[in-house]
Amino acid sequence: MEEVQEYLKKDRSPQQHFLYPLLLQEYIYTLAHDDSLNGSIFYEPIEFIGYDNKFSLVLVKRLIIRMYQQNFLIYLVNDSNQNRFGGHSNYFYSHFFYSQMVSKGFSVIVEIPFSLRLVSSSEEKEIPKSQNLGSIHSIFPFLEDKLSHLNNVSDILIPHPIHFEILVQILQCWIQDVPSLHLLRFFLHKYQNLNKTIQSNKTIYVFSKENKRLFWFLYNSYVSECEFLLVFFHKQSCYLRSTSSGAFLERSHFYGKMEHIIIVCCNNFQKTLWPVKDPLIHYVRYQGKAILASRGTHLLMKKWRYYFVNFWQYYFHFWSQPYRMHINSLLNYSFYFMGYLLGVLINPYAVKNQMLENSFLIDTVINKFDTIIPIIPLIGSLSKAKFCTFSGHPISKPIWADLLDFDIIDRFGRICRNLSHYHSGSSKKQSLYRIKYILRLSGGXXLARKHKSTXVPLLQRLGSGLLEEFFTEEXQVLSFFFPKTTLFTLHGSHRERIWSLDIIRINDLVNN
């Protein structure tokens, strides 16, 4: 990144930066090959049509030499389909392989302007760095603190863009390098044409996994545009509760913008959109799923839905389906978010109050944030990963039968520990114990398949060693948070809720 900053400092005008020459630098492809961004708990890297996606500086240098040839990038995109199913001998010399390398390098390059802007912004504002803020589990303590005091919630599925050109137009506001935008069009149209011509579901799945980094960058840019005005209203409304002189200046500027937005809405939508002034609006998003909660009435949530539909319709030129936005009362509704079923439970309490010689009972109600592990989607994910059947019956993992016993146990144990780590915030962990039981029997069945034996005597022979391997992580976490003098069993601690602040990505099984 330091080399990139030195390159961009050569020209002081930020609008004259040309990013495409960075494709000729070897360190760009080294950054793109960083496998730490694409780790998986399954230890199964994605293979492209049966071949290993190897990295070599020799291949990078050969690619850079070819890129100096005239019209190489055009042939690279147009002819990559013809060489996709070539033989193993010419795979590393094919246009398809070079197309993969260029697209991954390009995904690193387009992130540079945003990364530098983020770093400079944090340095100017002197924002302290905190590793805990990067944890996706930090969302749940926020929901636990807020949802129990709110009335209505709207879970939203953000629509997908109907055309790739919308993604390019969004980036035009941030990237002034026209050749780089044209190259992005080449790659987007290549993937679009492939999805139209190839009919195999497995092949389409592999194509969708070719460049996760570029895909998520484009998708996050698109989503940030979808929620831009919502974030603006929410942030500026918070100033209404402030009393500082600087905030008063912000208020007048905010009122001017609100009037301007109302005029624009009247001209474009032919109907007046209600500017939302309620500061008690809470918005949370992860990937394509968003939650909008408020203490206001059901009518207020309908106004927000009307605002979203019209904004998406006139700004992104597509209709939003009604099923993508559900409005419900929190007390009667549970919604799926990031691998949990979230809701609010009503807990009645009787409080005894004594005044002088008279005593009486007061009935009160306390709303409690509830988190449940959905067992059916998790079993479906295990079935999809070939750990069990659709009904939850454990089966062996034949692809792991050739591994060493230690490696098989380590892989199953890693999956169990990751699931326990991610679902440690559940209020009821019986479903998690069932999932771990399925994985334990699946691991035993895989070992029995390797040794050509049955699972029961093999599990009896391994005994507590295999059990300890599968449950040691949860025991360590619980012993860290609770005193050693506290007596509890593993299954008796199912009511303890622990949010981990070191999780930077959602679990693979949960995300399926």
From Swiss-Prot:
Coiled coil: none
InterPro entries, per the entry: Domain_X (IPR024937), Maturase_MatK (IPR002866), Maturase_MatK_N (IPR024942)
Keywords: Chloroplast, mRNA processing, Plastid, RNA-binding, tRNA processing
HAMAP family xrefs: MatK
UniProt similarity note: Belongs to the intron maturase 2 family. MatK subfamily.
One GO location term (cellular component): chloroplast
Job of this protein: Usually encoded in the trnK tRNA gene intron. Probably assists in splicing its own and other chloroplast group II introns.
BP-aspect Gene Ontology terms: mRNA processing; RNA splicing; tRNA processing
Protein name: Maturase K
